[in-house]
């Protein structure tokens, strides 16, 4: 399928075998950029994205956190926007989705305690479906037990969790991403261009101009 569009006077062509149906797992205090940017980007290229949170419904919101790099030894944290969910968690049937997106921030810390969430992550990996995780999203991958023998990027503070889960931590720049089979990972939001470009490639979406 080809969707032409004009941007800055240039004709862009977005090619994909078909529009994909994607699931995004979010929770309270997910990172602001890492939630909204992939959500809007994937919608913009023609995919369907269902953003869900355990025990919440479409129209409910999650609070987000803004993580920034301001010269301290770790990231700073501020209150972000409210992000509105567009699908009921209870209605999620993983077999009907083509890919999974996991933002970082605080949310993965508690989402990994929910066996329903871990089962969703395992389904996508066992089915070989594309999974995109950024920053602390790797905590869900580790808790789901899907990193054995895999190479995974994450926020550097998550490197011990990646290794303890049997994975190899990809030591890449904060603006870079890494693809290992169906798994596309990155250290933080500065990597969004590389991370989303690699995820779109794994999904089979091409943008030409």
Identify the meaning behind each predicted range.
Residues 9-127, 140-151, 159-209:
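Extended, subdomain-level signal for the structured scaffold at the beginning of enzyme domains
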Residues 134-137:
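Short, thiol/selenol-centered motifs that function as redox-active sites or metal-ligating centers
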């Amino acid at each position: 399928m080809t969707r032409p569009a004009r941007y800055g006077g240039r004709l862009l062509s977005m090619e994909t075998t078909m529009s994909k149906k994607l699931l995004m797992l979010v929770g309270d205090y997910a990172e602001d950029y890492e939630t909204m940017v992939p959500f809007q980007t994937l919608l913009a290229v023609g995919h369907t994205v269902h953003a869900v949170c355990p025990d919440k419904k479409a129209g409910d919101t999650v609070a987000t956190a803004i993580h920034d790099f301001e010269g301290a030894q770790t990231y700073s944290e501020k209150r972000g926007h409210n992000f509105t969910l567009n699908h009921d968690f209870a209605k999620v049937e993983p077999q009907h989705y083509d890919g999974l997106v996991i933002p970082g921030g605080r949310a993965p810390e508690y989402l990994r305690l929910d066996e329903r969430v871990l089962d969703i992550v395992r389904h996508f990996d066992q089915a070989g479906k594309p999974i995109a995780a950024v920053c602390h999203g790797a905590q869900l991958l580790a808790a789901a037990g899907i990193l054995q023998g895999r190479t995974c990027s994450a926020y550097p503070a998550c490197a011990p969790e990646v290794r303890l889960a049997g994975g190899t931590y990809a030591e890449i720049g904060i603006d870079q991403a890494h693809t290992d089979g169906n798994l596309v990972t990155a250290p933080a939001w500065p990597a969004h261009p590389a991370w989303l470009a690699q995820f779109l490639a794994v999904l089979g979406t091409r943008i030409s101009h």
